[in-house]
């Protein structure tokens, strides 16, 4: 049962890291390649939403680590 707990913890950590990376990559496209999204009239709104989602995933990751890192992370 302990193995499952560690795997669940690790899966959540990877989920949040993956979400953050996906949002960061999309934001990079906006910043570096505006031509790719040139016909999209809501750049700032969309970018703000991506930052909000990344911040939420980051907060979840921090809270998970704060609450459970000592118990479930593999050192």
Positions of the model-derived regions?
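Extended, charge-rich alpha-helical interface modules
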Residues: 2-75
